[in-house]
Amino acid sequence: MAAVTSIMRVQQVLQSAVDAALRPHGLTFARYEALVLLTFAKRGSLPMRVMGERLQLHPTSVTNIVDRLEADGLVKRLPHPTDRRTTLAEITEAGRERREAATKAVTDIDFGLRGLTERQTAQLTDLLAKVRKAVGDFED
């Protein structure tokens, strides 16, 4: 149980650091993740249903995230070209710029890993990957 407690506490500390880095950019972590997802989509847009699947969020949560991003001019909704039942969320140029600035802020954070050697960081990454695979978070 000590390992689980440590992992959960580290997650809280890291999440707090990420939230603090994103706050000046007017983003929450969930909104930032949505912008990142749309940035890497082939056309810069995805069906909102697919966003929910990839972000592992309830459709209502995706709607709320897109509502806020749209209100800030970072995303726009578009009708799907071939499926009238589907709405696409598309990142705007302002959204790309905000995502880029926010990513720089997040990557500049000292997550406490600078005190580890490269080997220790690799070991930690490998161990956490094994735990994630064991609980079904992802496959090889």
What label would you give each PLM region?
Residues 48, 66-67:
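Short, hydrophobic-biased segments on the C-terminal half of alpha helices
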